[in-house]
UniProtKB/Swiss-Prot annotation:
Protein name: Fucoxanthin-chlorophyll a-c binding protein C, chloroplastic
Subunit composition and interactions: The LHC complex of chromophytic algae is composed of fucoxanthin, chlorophyll A and C bound non-covalently by fucoxanthin chlorophyll proteins (FCPs). The ratio of pigments in this LHC is; fucoxanthin: chlorophyll C: chlorophyll A; (0.6-1): (0.1-0.3): (1).
InterPro entries on file: Chloro_AB-bd_pln, Chloroa_b-bind
Family: Belongs to the fucoxanthin chlorophyll protein family.
The organelle targeting sequence, given as a residue range: 1-38
GO BP, one annotated term: photosynthesis, light harvesting
Keyword terms of this UniProt record: Chlorophyll, Chloroplast, Chromophore, Light-harvesting polypeptide, Membrane, Photosynthesis, Photosystem II, Plastid, Thylakoid, Transit peptide, Transmembrane, Transmembrane helix
Gene Ontology cellular component annotations, sorted alphabetically: chloroplast thylakoid membrane; light-harvesting complex; photosystem II
Induction: Levels are increased twofold when transferred from high intensity to low intensity blue or white light.
Principal subcellular localization: plastid
């Protein structure tokens, strides 16, 4: 009995060792995660009015690579949304001349604006759109390695001289402005789509100001 007690006692430090080690590792990991999150709070985009805003906790255990991947996606979606807003407004006020599809007897002037256009585009036209998007994804929208997320100037930048002439502070300000505009555009194009589906009146500001317009 005595020998059994001695055996258990001698094993006890070994049993405590891994537990103590794991606790230290967890503490270190938590500190590391907290420090990483604090570094994200000073990144471009963590700005007024929301500051650092991560309601889904996507950055809780993220490293720098994960953050830059998310930022890359955000920048790209923001640019697409800004183009979508510009396209929506352009299509509302002007149309290309001529035919969109001779086989379908469909002119550009006959095309509705907004989401409704998807139901009118011939299959061949949709195939061209998706093919072009695929080409951009695979061959054009490639981030310059070692540069900031969203730098797609692999094929050269015609504005390189003016960009390089800017100070680091000015470049950071320009990138922050683009992020804010992209975020606003994502909310804007979503609002246009929602209001189009609700009552076919997407331009809420026009409605508030009493400015009439014909949509589709």
């Amino acid at each position: 009995m005595k020998s059994a007690i001695m055996a258990v006692a001698s094993a006890a430090p070994g049993l405590r060792g891994p537990s103590a080690f794991n606790g230290a590792a967890l503490t270190t990991s938590a500190k590391s995660s907290s420090a990483m999150k604090m570094s994200f709070e000073s990144e471009i985009g963590a700005q007024a009015p929301l500051g650092f805003w991560d309601p889904l906790g996507l950055l809780e255990d993220a490293d720098q690579d994960a953050f830059e991947r998310l930022r890359y996606v955000e920048v790209k979606l923001g640019r697409i949304a800004m183009l979508a807003i510009a396209g929506h407004l352009t299509q509302q006020n002007a149309r290309l001349p001529g035919m969109l599809s001779n086989s379908a007897n469909l002119s550009f002037a006959d095309m509705p604006n907004g989401v409704a256009a998807l139901s009118k585009i011939p299959p061949g036209g949709l195939a061209q759109i998706f093919g072009f998007i695929g080409f951009l994804e695979l061959a054009v929208m490639k981030n310059v390695e070692g540069s900031f997320p969203g730098d797609f100037t692999l094929g050269g930048n015609p504005f390189a001289s003016s960009w390089d002439a800017m100070s680091a502070e000015t470049q950071a300000s320009k990138r922050a402005i683009e992020l804010n505009n992209g975020r606003a555009a994502q909310m804007g194009i979503l609002a246009l789509m929602v209001h189009e589906e609700l009552n076919n009146k997407p331009y809420v500001i026009n409605d508030l100001l009493g400015a009439s317009y014909n949509f589709n």
